[in-house]
Amino acid sequence: MEIKQLFALSVALLMAFPAFADNYPIVSPTVEYTDSTGVLIIKHTSESFTEQAPLTIRFKANPENTAGYTMNYQWTINNTKDPSFNIVNYTEEFEQTFTRAGEFSIKLLYTYTDADGKQMSEQTDSIKFTIKESKLDFPNAFSPNGDRLNDKYKAKVCQSIVEFRASIYNRWGKKLYSWTDPYDGWDGTFNGKPVKQGVYFVNVVAKGADGHEYHIRRDVNLLRGYTEVTNTTTP
């Protein structure tokens, strides 16, 4: 008799709380991005990471067991160092590009409603990441001689640069080359032909993810007869 009563009580509880009788919806949020080496990185809740700007991230809720339920999502992204920064998104999956330095926290609140209109909400653990502050510096010489070592004049330090323009001039002030990709550079040519060895001038205007503005102007020594030497032996 006692067993029958316990069974009846269990059935009654399951009928009163159908979410526990079936597999109710769950989410497994992830963030995906490609790092500076071209590798796809996937992070989950309670994980953290550090990257540089600009950084484009795809946010995915990855819901399961949603049959028979209506799903609603609310992503919240905050910059803990900048209270004015706040992003809210209501889609299951979306992309966002980050161009500011700071420490960011991502949370997902999801709500599921069954056919009878009963609704439940749950919030996931946060995913945290840091966008590095900016750095930018250029060398004063390069040697475009085909040895694949220092063949292109480009930044020797580059981190979290979100706006960039550089131009090369000869000693008479003629512009020879310009580029807008902070990881690109000048190969020592003008109109497809190598320029002479000598001193040139670079002008760089850039802005970092931390708001820092760069104005770099300096001489550039182009050394055609110079060969880079690398030490391949262990001292």
What is each stretch, according to the model?
Residues 85-105, 184-187:
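Solvent-exposed segments in extracellular or luminal domains encompassing
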Residues 23-45, 134-139:
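Proline-enriched interdomain boundary motifs that mark the N-terminal boundary
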Residues 16-18:
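N-terminal signal peptide c-region/cleavage motif recognized by signal peptidases
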Residues 67-96:
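Surface-exposed, flexible coil segments in extracellular/virion-facing regions
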Residues 103-114, 198-204:
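Short, aromatic- and glycine-rich surface loops/edge beta-strands on solvent-exposed regions
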Residues 1-7:
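Bacterial N-terminal signal peptides that target proteins for export
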Residues 44-49, 53-63, 128-235:
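Short loop/turn motifs at secondary-structure boundaries
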Residues 111-119, 207-211:
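Short, solvent-exposed loop/turn segments at the edges of extracellular beta-sandwich modules
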